[in-house]
């Protein structure tokens, strides 16, 4: 009997859908969820964010860092 293939469940994009939050550089609480404890942007394969939204998220995080709303690095 052959082994059954393992299928990973496809994660859904948290920014798609009706009740999805908008990506905004001023919403630091939302952006903090997509930054590691070292201050790095978490990749989309971990957060399940789509490519278009990941680019917008990265842009918002970088903008918030520039305006000193978020830190560049955490010690």
UniProtKB/Swiss-Prot annotation:
Q: Which GO terms describe its molecular function?
A: small ribosomal subunit rRNA binding; structural constituent of ribosome
The keyword Hydrolase is annotated on this UniProt entry: no
In terms of domain of life, where is this protein from? Bacteria
**Keyword Ribosomal protein set for record:** yes
The similarity annotation says: Belongs to the bacterial ribosomal protein bS18 family.
Q: What does this protein do?
A: Binds as a heterodimer with protein bS6 to the central domain of the 16S rRNA, where it helps stabilize the platform of the 30S subunit.
Recorded protein name is Small ribosomal subunit protein bS18
Q: Which organism is it from?
A: Jannaschia sp. (strain CCS1)
Which gene is this protein's source? Answer: rpsR
């Amino acid at each position: 009997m052959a082994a059954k293939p393992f299928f990973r469940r496809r994660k859904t994009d948290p920014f798609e859908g009706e009740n999805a939050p908008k990506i905004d550089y001023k919403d630091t609480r939302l952006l903090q969820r997509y930054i590691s404890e070292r201050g790095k942007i978490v990749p989309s394969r971990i957060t399940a964010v789509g490519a278009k939204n990941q680019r917008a998220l990265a842009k918002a995080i970088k903008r918030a860092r520039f305006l000193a709303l978020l830190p560049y690095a955490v010690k």
